[in-house]
Amino acid sequence: MKTEIHIGNLIKEKLRQQERSNAWLARKLFMDSSNVSKMLKKQYIDTEILLRISLILEEDFFSYYSYLYNSTINSSSGKEK
């Protein structure tokens, strides 16, 4: 299954919308800002950290994966009919 979700980019976009910086997020996560910057360049992020980011930014980033999963399941079941 190929995914086109780049979770780091989605988080960066949400930070931009909220007019927040990587340094702000780093402080909230109790992480070094350079580590946060590196993390946001990645397509995948550890689920525990993603949960913390979701809570901090008040955005369910897991829903992007749920949507992709449901779309895949629905298109697969449509092919079997």
Model-identified regions with their sequence ranges:
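A short, Lys/Arg-rich alpha-helix, primarily the initiator
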Residues: 1-20
